[in-house]
A protein has these predicted regions:
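Sec-dependent N-terminal signal peptides
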Residues: 3-13
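Small beta-barrel nucleic-acid-binding modules, primarily SNase/OB-fold domains
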Residues: 15-144
């Protein structure tokens, strides 16, 4: 428990300073896929009064936005495709783990990675063209 708090409170600054941050790994029950690079997990390891659910954004990637957050119709379409890819990857996986690195820069989500049957969701998103590497710099447009 103390290890988790150390990670969640102290690592956010370091997470953006390095491309391979150290994290804490847990078996994960994925409750919802929010978009291509964000999932909601069950987090029974968190103490009360924290919510037993945690939004986890995949560290080191940017996927296209979907819906009203997209800057153009092609980005919205690509965002839906990225979300569908993540949902499918989660659905067909048997062993699901999450590696938590620390809070994102806005504090509402935790940065991490999903390990699905031993494969990094981050790596799968990039390899299949649904994400770009992203470490906090200005984002590239998906509308080109």
């Amino acid at each position: 428990m103390k290890q988790l708090f150390a990670v969640l409170l102290l690592v956010p600054v370091l997470a953006f300073a390095q491309k391979q941050p150290q994290g804490v790994t847990y078996d994960a029950q994925i409750l919802n896929v929010t978009d291509g690079d964000t999932v909601v997990i069950s987090a029974p390891f968190l103490p009360a009064p924290l919510k037993p659910q945690l939004a986890v954004r995949v560290f080191g990637v940017d996927t296209p936005e979907k819906g009203h957050r997209a800057m153009c119709p092609s980005e919205a379409q690509r965002g839906e495709q990225a979300s569908a890819f993540t949902k499918n990857a989660v659905a067909k996986s048997v062993k699901r783990q999450v590696v938590l690195y620390g809070w994102d820069k806005f504090g509402g989500r935790v940065l991490g990675d999903m390990i699905l049957d031993g494969q990094s969701l981050r790596a799968m998103l990039i390899a299949n063209g649904f994400a770009r590497e992203y470490y906090g710099e200005a984002k590239q447009s998906w509308c080109n």
